[in-house]
Amino acid sequence: MQIFVKTLTGKTITLEVESSDTIDNVKSKIQDKEGIPPDQQRLIFAGKQLEDGRTLSDYNIQKESTLHLVLRLRGGMQIFVKTLTGKTITLEVESSDTIDNVKSKIQDKEGIPPDQQRLIFAGKQLEDGRTLSDYNIQKESTLHLVLRLRGGMQIFVKTLTGKTITLEVESSDTIDNVKSKIQDKEGIPPDQQRLIFAGKQLEDGRTLSDYNIQKESTLHLVLRLRGGF
């Protein structure tokens, strides 16, 4: 079948492939046509970076699909990931790698599924779709890996305007953490947020489990007047 590869310069390359071809094979074909070494190629499809050992059919890439080709910065960089057991893992990454990519690399090395990984840097939990450069993570930075309780849970936050926000949380998350997640989604600073559950205002240092907030519970968000009490 034919697929297309679009470069950052806007050029489109046509390739003859089989669904059973690996991403490595595709990179070799691109090298044959364009002279770009495979180790400098990153291929993206449906927003996801494609891994060398996988096949086109693994990613549901069908005839006339378009892949995007991004060139790697020469050589990338090393970062460290420290686990709760004190073990330190070294990873080869690019600043343009997403947190998803980093979790996949940790899975390759340690066998921990990405959905059980939480990565922390500078006290902040890192979100999957963001890149290392978004968080200003540079060479030889150290991330901390915390394992999620199985799968976490969803809760809802209802604002006074009637809008409902869905959040991914753990029962062990503090009210501060929840307010940070609301800030990430809605841009409201935590110090302007008051969260109410079961008629009770929630205190920052307490956890969701302290208040018996379970999956699919609904919290109410009230905005503090600036300078109020």
From Swiss-Prot:
SMART domains: UBQ. InterPro entries: Ubiquitin-like_dom (IPR000626), Ubiquitin-like_domsf (IPR029071), Ubiquitin_CS (IPR019954), Ubiquitin_dom (IPR019956), Ubiquitin_ubiquitin-like (IPR050158). Gene3D superfamilies: Phosphatidylinositol 3-kinase Catalytic Subunit, Chain A, domain 1 (3.10.20.90). GO terms for biological process: cell morphogenesis; cellular response to heat; cellular response to stress; filamentous growth; filamentous growth of a population of unicellular organisms; modification-dependent protein catabolic process; phenotypic switching; protein ubiquitination. There is a cross-link at residue 76 (Glycyl lysine isopeptide (Gly-Lys) (interchain with K-? in acceptor proteins)). Its main location: cytoplasm. Residues 229 form a propeptide. It is found in: Cytoplasm; Nucleus. Residues 1-76, 77-152, 153-228 form the Ubiquitin-like domain. Disruption phenotype: Confers pleiotropic effects like an increased sensitivity to mild heat shock, increased formation of colony morphology variants and induction of hyphal and pseudohypal development. Induces cell cycle defects, as well as sensitivity to thermal, oxidative and cell wall stresses. Rapidly lose viability under starvation conditions. There is a cross-link at residues 6, 11, 27, 29, 33, 48, 63 (Glycyl lysine isopeptide (Lys-Gly) (interchain with G-Cter in ubiquitin)). GO terms for cellular component: cytoplasm; nucleus; plasma membrane. Keywords: Cytoplasm, Isopeptide bond, Nucleus, Ubl conjugation. SUPFAM superfamilies: Ubiquitin-like. One of its GO terms (molecular function) is protein tag activity. Belongs to the ubiquitin family. Ubiquitin exists either covalently attached to another protein, or free (unanchored). When covalently bound, it is conjugated to target proteins via an isopeptide bond either as a monomer (monoubiquitin), a polymer linked via different Lys residues of the ubiquitin (polyubiquitin chains) or a linear polymer linked via the initiator Met of the ubiquitin (linear polyubiquitin chains). Ubiquitin is encoded by several different genes. UBI3 is a polyprotein with one copy of ubiquitin fused to ribosomal protein eS31. UBI4 is a polyprotein containing 3 exact head to tail repeats of ubiquitin. This is Polyubiquitin.
